[in-house]
Structure formats: C-alpha cells, structure tokens
C-alpha cells in the first residue's frame, strides 16, 4: 500500500465517520448506520451481548435516539485510523449528551473500536465494539469519567 493510497483511504474513512457523527446528532438512524456492512457484528454498551446485522444495529440506534428530547450532542475525540490493504481499524473516545424524555440529562463518554473492510471499493464497518470502564470494587460502570 502506497502512502498516497493510505492517505486517500484514511480520508474516505474519516468522511464516513464524520457523516455518522452528523447523522447521530440529527437522530437519523438510517443515515447513522449507512456505513455499516449488512453483516456487521456490534458489541454495544447495553444489552444484549451483540447485535448482528445492520437492521439490528439500526433498530438499536432508533431505540436510543427515541430516548432524547431534541438533538444529541455527539463527538469523537482522539480518533485514530489505521489503514491496511482492504482492512482498517479506528479507535476513539466518544461523547454523547442531551436531554432525556424521561427527565434528566445524559452526559457520558465511552470507548469505541471499529473494524472496517473495503468492499466493492467502499469502506464499511464490519465490526463495532463499544465499552465503558467499570469500577472493580463495586462492579458498576464508571460513567462519569472524562478524558
């Protein structure tokens, strides 16, 4: 892989992730999942242990978006992209905040690793792994951590 193609691929991946961020802010589940492969496997921070397929990931996004009153503040911080021949991975710290329909406000950070494959000339997310650290003394998630 040449430096030029690596730079081009990294820019294409960054563009797809920027679109995912914009769609999440707009609570548009269809657009937010348009970068996912049809056979994506997602390990989310909430039940169940995995979501298999883009339809399951889209349904999860719709369910999450429906908990907000208005737009979601959403960002990726410390995004790192590593590109190889036909495969790539990213990792970032993700932040979401917004007013909840049930009352109160969500304001949390979590870790995300994405595995991408280049299929038919297009980068798609084949695997997503999101996680929240936990306190080993209490067994509870550490939701108040900030970078």
What spans do the regions from the language model cover?
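A beta-strand edge to alpha-helix "cap/lid" segment located at domain peripheries
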Residues: 2-34, 41-147
